[in-house]
Amino acid sequence: ILIPILIVTSLIKDSNQKPAIKIKDNEIITSVPNCSEPTIKIDKIRNIKLLDNVEIGNKQVGYKEDKCYAGYFDTQFGTCFIYINPNIHSYIYFETKDDKCLINYESEEKTKELYETIKNI
């Protein structure tokens, strides 16, 4: 009886959490409810671009809500790890050795600030 109660309590707690992104110790850390927290080492980023328009296709694996897409999705760049609010039309695209990534932040202005921060580290 105790195990199911703990599982339900954990799911309720996780469902109330909001997606978040932060930079800490030269890493981009994404946090999505009920998902692992992937980290991207900033010194491994190459080919970084700030974009106004991106075509997002089907979800391969991940999370898709009205205000947050996170996981692997088809894009105009191929399959990318994305962490975006689809209602914000400013995106940071970059590549690492293993992945193509697409992220944005709370607003177009905050996304541009995040881009400048990443670019200058």
Feature names for model-found ranges:
Residues I92-I121:
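Non-cytosolic head/periplasmic domains of membrane-anchored proteins
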Residues I1-K18:
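Alpha-helical transmembrane spans
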Residues K18, C35, C101:
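Short, flexible active-site loop motifs that bind/organize anionic cofactors or intermediates
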Residues K22, I29-S31, T39-K41, L102-N104:
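Generic structural detector for well-ordered beta-strands
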Residues S31-K97:
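Non-transmembrane, membrane-adjacent beta-strand/coil modules in membrane-associated proteins
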Residues D14-I28:
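Alpha-helical transmembrane signal-anchor/signal-peptide segments
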Residues I1, P33-N34, S107:
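Short, structured coil/loop segments at alpha-helix boundaries
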